[in-house]
């Protein structure tokens, strides 16, 4: 695991954009051979990105060969019938911990988990096993963010707002959630449906520690769809 301090990471990502570079098997940029995601990372870094969020052991290993930017790592793996799939069990945490990345992000919603644990207990177990690893909670509502902080999480992400059955469905960032968490003194990494620089600028003014932008930069299919829809 990476030994970077929380303070050092905050300084490194301050006032910048962390770019999420991912492609899942059903998406156009995914290849079995790999090699595509590191190219997105190089483009993001040349464009001024201050960090990268990435999925899977393979992609993260390839990314580390082309950049020294800090990485927020996840492993997306389905565990039906339960809904959580972002670093959903200790198995995924173990795999990520071996990669020497700055932050591991995990699903910290209140939904039923495959391992049967309450989220606070899962966080406790992760921190006990990897006490020096920085952790980010992917959450969907205010209460989940607070619960994660109380359990010892370093950063709270708004990643899953709109993606749980009980969170607001809006076509854009959950400004209200981001601001409420910041006002409560939480170290927030804003993420989710941030489509424009103007939205990112507004979010920065709330006092977030970091901002993750994904689809608006690295998913050309989604970008095209938004333009096509905008012409109708």
UniProtKB/Swiss-Prot annotation:
<dbReference type="GO" id="GO:0047465">
    <property type="term" value="F:N-acylglucosamine-6-phosphate 2-epimerase activity"/>
</dbReference>
<keyword id="KW-0413">Isomerase</keyword>
<dbReference type="InterPro" id="IPR011060">
    <property type="entry name" value="RibuloseP-bd_barrel"/>
</dbReference>
<comment type="similarity">
    <text>Belongs to the NanE family.</text>
</comment>
<dbReference type="GO" id="GO:0019262">
    <property type="term" value="P:N-acetylneuraminate catabolic process"/>
</dbReference>
<comment type="function">
    <text>Converts N-acetylmannosamine-6-phosphate (ManNAc-6-P) to N-acetylglucosamine-6-phosphate (GlcNAc-6-P).</text>
</comment>
<protein>
    <recommendedName>
        <fullName>Putative N-acetylmannosamine-6-phosphate 2-epimerase 1</fullName>
        <ecNumber>5.1.3.9</ecNumber>
    </recommendedName>
</protein>
<dbReference type="GO" id="GO:0005829">
    <property type="term" value="C:cytosol"/>
</dbReference>
<dbReference type="Pfam" id="PF04131">
    <property type="entry name" value="NanE"/>
</dbReference>
<keyword id="KW-0119">Carbohydrate metabolism</keyword>
<dbReference type="GO" id="GO:0006053">
    <property type="term" value="P:N-acetylmannosamine catabolic process"/>
</dbReference>
<comment type="pathway">
    <text>Amino-sugar metabolism; N-acetylneuraminate degradation; D-fructose 6-phosphate from N-acetylneuraminate: step 3/5.</text>
</comment>
<dbReference type="InterPro" id="IPR007260">
    <property type="entry name" value="NanE"/>
</dbReference>
<dbReference type="InterPro" id="IPR013785">
    <property type="entry name" value="Aldolase_TIM"/>
</dbReference>
<dbReference type="GO" id="GO:0005975">
    <property type="term" value="P:carbohydrate metabolic process"/>
</dbReference>
């Amino acid at each position: 695991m990476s030994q970077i301090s929380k303070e050092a990471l905050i300084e490194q990502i301050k006032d910048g954009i962390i770019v999420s570079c991912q492609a899942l098997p059903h998406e156009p940029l995914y290849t079995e051979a790999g090699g595509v995601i590191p190219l997105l990372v190089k483009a993001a870094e040349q464009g001024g990105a201050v960090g990268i969020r990435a999925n899977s052991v393979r992609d993260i290993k390839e990314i580390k060969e082309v950049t020294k930017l800090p990485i927020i790592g996840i492993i997306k793996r389905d565990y039906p019938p339960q809904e959580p799939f972002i670093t959903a069990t200790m198995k995924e945490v173990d795999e990520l911990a071996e990669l020497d990345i700055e932050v591991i992000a995990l699903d910290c919603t209140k939904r039923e988990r495959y391992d049967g644990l309450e989220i606070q207990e899962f966080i406790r177990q992760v921190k006990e096993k990897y006490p020096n690893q920085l952790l980010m909670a992917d959450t969907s509502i205010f209460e989940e963010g607070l619960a994660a902080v109380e359990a010892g999480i370093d950063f709270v992400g708004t990643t899953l707002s709109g993606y749980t059955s009980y969170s607001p469905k809006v076509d854009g960032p959950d400004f209200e959630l981001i601001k409420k968490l910041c006002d409560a003194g939480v170290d927030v990494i804003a993420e989710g449906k941030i489509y424009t620089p103007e939205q990112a600028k507004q979010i920065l003014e709330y006092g977030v520690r970091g901002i993750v932008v994904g689809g608006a930069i690295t998913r050309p299919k989604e970008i095209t769809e938004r333009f096509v829809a905008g012409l109708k």
